[in-house]
């Protein structure tokens, strides 16, 4: 499940990259993709919480330590 979520987040990262370089309202669109990715992480955490709280923590840590930072660097240019 974690690998499938990572694939989805990688796709969203690429959408954000392309959007930031293409569209006039790119920041708004990129933030929408960011929110979709965050929603996927929250849903994945909720789905695994009952059966595997450790995996939920792993998913949230992956988001906070890796993907959130990648998204923010693209969107805010840091």
Please place each PLM-identified region on the residue numbering.
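Acidic, low-complexity, intrinsically disordered interaction modules
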Residues: 22-64
């Amino acid at each position: 499940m974690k690998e499938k979520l990572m694939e989805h987040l990688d796709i969203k990262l690429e959408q954000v990259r392309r959007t930031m370089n293409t569209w006039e309202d790119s920041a708004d669109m990129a933030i929408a993709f960011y929110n979709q990715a965050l929603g996927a992480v929250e849903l994945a955490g909720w789905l695994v919480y009952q059966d595997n709280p450790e995996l939920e923590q792993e998913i949230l840590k992956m988001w906070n330590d890796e993907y959130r930072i990648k998204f923010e660097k693209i969107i805010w240019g840091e």
